[in-house]
Amino acid sequence: KPSVLRHSLNALRNEKTSLTKYRRQELMALRKAPADLAIERNTWFHVGMNASQQYIYGLRRMLEPIKEHVDNNFTPITQRLIDEYQPIRLKITDFLTQAENFIATGRFENYRELLDKAEQFETELSEYRKKHIDRIQMAQDNETFQLSLVYLNLLQESQLLISSMRHQLRAAKKFKE
């Protein structure tokens, strides 16, 4: 597993490099647009690019503590936490896929519905996080404390990924208008 995690970190670094190159190319293209259009689009372009960067940073903030945990041979994740996070992961994947589809096709007819569902999901993630904090505070077992912190970080970063998705989707819609 450590090699998979290391590979994932390298892939995120490569994505960051690609994103930086893409950003430079887009900025050059914006300079060629009429000034009034460029000014308005520039704002939404930067909001969208910042959200893209937040995806990368968020994934790295998820991955690095997990990699450290695995590298140091700490306690494996419990089946209970796996079962709890699996539907969360699937929902995140679904939201990101839907957002990608809106952006790739430029069709934003039902985007408001996705934003509303994502906002509700952020609230659910906040509840998961609060419940997990309560579990940490109630636990008598110091052996699982580090694992609990890694999982808490995963929940927090998951919430931030959804927030970034919402910002990016709004920015993409405004950019296309």
Where are the model-predicted features located?
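Cytosolic, long alpha-helical scaffolding segments
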Residues: 1-177
